[in-house]
Amino acid sequence: MSSEEKYIMAIDQGTTSSRAIIFNKKGEKIASSQKEFPQIFPQAGWVEHNANQIWNSVQSVIAGAFIESSIKPGQIEAIGITNQRETTVVWDKKTGLPIYNAIVWQSRQTAPIADQLKQEGHTNMIHEKTGLVIDAYFSATKVRWILDHVPGAQERAEKGELLFGTIDTWLVWKLTDGLVHVTDYSNAARTMLYNIKELKWDDEILELLNIPKAMLPEVKSNSEVYGKTTPFHFYGGEVPISGMAGDQQAALFGQLAFEPGMVKNTYGTGSFIIMNTGEEMQLSQNNLLTTIGYGINGKVHYALEGSIFIAGSAIQWLRDGLRMIETSSESEGLAQSSTSDDEVYVVPAFTGLGAPYWDSNARGSVFGLTRGTSKEDFVKATLQSIAYQVRDVIDTMQVDSGIDIQQLRVDGGAAMNNLLMQFQADILGIDIARAKNLETTALGAAFLAGLSVGYWESMDELKELNATGQLFQATMNESRKEKLYKGWRKAVKATQVFAQED
């Protein structure tokens, strides 16, 4: 390797593992290193992480990527960070030690605080300012919980001795050895404390939750130099940290969804659908979240987001729970050999229903079984349930935004399933564009970092770098498509009726 060649490093800090990926100028992955870290479950429904273990895992993968590639720290032009969103850390400003475990986005331990806010009638005020629904999912209730449960924390926070941050903030603080306390628009927008219209921390919400402003990081754009790594923490390199975005927003950017009306879906454990709505903020009237997609070059692009709780994990359930398949990839072949007429519906509401239903009491159900139903039919119906849920969200997005969606850009593990992608195109009646490079989250962070230091000249230059790998076009006729979808809506309705209290 010539020492002249320069690269961008993306740090992708996820819910179960941390990764460091090195990209070249063509947006190709040169090296990557991954390390899992422990999940902590103090009680049912609670999920926590040790923030120091997260930091250790990040240091370890940075080293791993250097070792695998023989690239030196000095060859890294810039670092981009992308992270699991909403997960909350509160630490001591002097010692740098967290005062409690990080409370993870999925954790329900703060649900009573969220319920109280709803009962007190704050739903509309919080929705109008933050674009979010009141839920334990977002950081606000998590900060309040830590301040309530750690002795003396409230008083220390008021004195300015404690700092709060989502994972992006924590990593920048550690990489710069405590010199920089910042977050970006996309992460701030998920705290339920940030006014996304006025682009500032919201005094009314902070007062309501009694969260001292002194704890909060400064909010910056998604593409600018926030600070440099301390050589001690980056194996001798002083490298600008110059791009940052929450994981789903980074994927939106990595999918090059720069124009209003462009939509991406990441098929992970759950499924996250984000639509760029441009520079106008559009409050959802139908239970989608309004959030910030990204802010770059002085302009903020807003977005609508719908989350589906169960997508890829429905395939894992077929494998681990029902043992119908040995590997996830086997689901495609089995579904392909099903001869049924798609009359079986699986509603995988294992943890309730996400957008646009938000029904936490619903549980999974199956409809349309006959004596002739086979394992193949069941596997196919489970795959189709992912596509039906995506249509629920896409239809809602079209209503909220008034924009006709022409194409869905896809990435994530289950996007490799051709049968699912074809059925997705059919049930939506639009084209599905699968990215050539499915590492869109890390790539998005790398793009944001590289743009800000001139490694890439412009967003136009990026458009050449992640072309569509494969296009799936709708082939199903309209009447069949609508008949199938009507059956799905009936199945969901019946599932909700079954979950109602007697």
From Swiss-Prot:
Q: Where does this protein have coiled-coil stretches? A: none
InterPro entries (UniProt xref): ATPase_NBD (IPR043129), Carb_kinase_FGGY (IPR000577), Carb_kinase_FGGY_CS (IPR018483), FGGY_C (IPR018485), FGGY_N (IPR018484), Glycerol_kin (IPR005999)
Q: How is it modified after translation?
A: The phosphoenolpyruvate-dependent sugar phosphotransferase system (PTS), including enzyme I, and histidine-containing protein (HPr) are required for the phosphorylation, which leads to the activation of the enzyme.
Amino-acid positions noted as binding glycerol in the UniProt annotation, renumbered to this chain: 85-86, 137, 247-248
List residues binding ATP: 15-17, 269, 312, 316, 413
Which residues does the record give as sn-glycerol 3-phosphate binding sites? 15, 85-86, 137, 247
Q: Which UniProt keywords apply?
A: ATP-binding, Glycerol metabolism, Kinase, Nucleotide-binding, Phosphoprotein, Transferase
Q: Which GO terms describe its biological process?
A: glycerol catabolic process; glycerol metabolic process; glycerol-3-phosphate metabolic process
The subunit field of the Swiss-Prot or TrEMBL record says:
Homotetramer and homodimer (in equilibrium).
Q: What name does the UniProt record give this protein?
A: Glycerol kinase
What is the organism field in this record?
Streptococcus agalactiae serotype V (strain ATCC BAA-611 / 2603 V/R)
Question: What's the source species' lineage?
Answer: Bacteria, Bacillati, Bacillota, Bacilli, Lactobacillales
Gene (UniProt): glpK
